[in-house]
Regions:
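Terminal domain-initiation and capping elements
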Residues: 1-96
Length: 96
């Protein structure tokens, strides 16, 4: 007689709405924001991003032309998008 293994438990990290994929906040490279300015904006708006992590993201944005800086639920993504745009960052439209 064989026994069925219990299903593996999935942790809910709050990154998805249950209705699809997470929403992505993307910052685009531009020629008017400094690395320090981008790092400051990212560290001021995004939870868990300090200035050093903001600098790493600024480098990724510069080298790749864009970077996903946060992903998660739509309402939170919209808030972060608005706040980063308010800091003068060049933003791509939200993507899912």
């Amino acid at each position: 007689m064989s026994t069925l293994a219990p299903p593996k438990e999935r942790l809910d990290r709050g990154e998805r709405s249950g209705l699809g994929r997470a929403w992505r906040v993307i910052v685009l490279n531009d020629d008017h924001n400094t690395f320090d300015g981008v790092a400051f904006a990212l560290s001021s708006v995004l939870p868990g991003v300090d200035f050093d992590a903001g600098m790493k993201l600024a480098n990724r944005i510069h080298n790749s032309g864009r970077a996903i800086v946060w992903s998660g639920e739509r309402e939170q993504a919209e808030l972060y998008w608005e706040q980063l745009a308010g800091h003068g960052l060049t933003m791509a439209p939200l993507e899912q």
